[in-house]
Amino acid sequence: EDPRIRAIIIRLDTPGGEVTTSDIIHNEILRFKAETKIPVVAMMMGLATSGGYYIASACDHIIAHPSTITGSIGVISVFPNIESLFGKIGVEMNVITSGDMKDSGSPFREMKSEEKEVFQAIVDTFYRKFLQVVYEGRKEQISMEKLQKIADGRVYTAQQALEFKLIDEIGYIDSAIDKALALSDLSEAKIVGFTYYPKSKTNLYATQLQEFPTLGNEDLQEMLQTLKSGFYYLWLPQLGR
């Protein structure tokens, strides 16, 4: 509502996060642009992978730092299995359910093949959503066919991302400022910074789940300790097979 705001630069430094969190932020950027007609520029820092790139695709222009790692277009679902650990310490879990699939994903037993099929279908659905979101944001730069070829979950350097049309240019924060000025038809402007503190409970979407991984400058060791079962647009190589 402040008429003095003529452009927004979003600095991204994140490996990604939960599917829903990523989609909410992406949608908020689109809604902001539609309501205000104010241009939004994405400035990728060290990491802008998976959910971070999902968010960037909502912006009018994407700039990556020369050392940025981005990409990781895909979905990961995490279901820990601690059955053998409990067996070693003599603990058994007795679970009563109303149906065979009610405790799907339980960490207290091995996952059944039919459960894997259910979760794989969900992962595939979220992956198609990811592809469509990126395509809608980048369709003037890349076709869906080319996007599908490079969206296999791998990460890219800034130079590779530029070659694949996932970003618009490589530069520094001054490049983002120059682009924001150009998109808003200004020759100069005052730059004001806003910082988001993750534990703030002041927004519409704030819930107790904020104590779990979200988008921001997370400590990955802490993230591993708090990662709950679910579906993520997240690059987390520590969970490698």
What are these regions (language model features)?
Residues E1-A42, G46-A48, C59-H65, I76-R241:
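N-terminal organellar transit peptides
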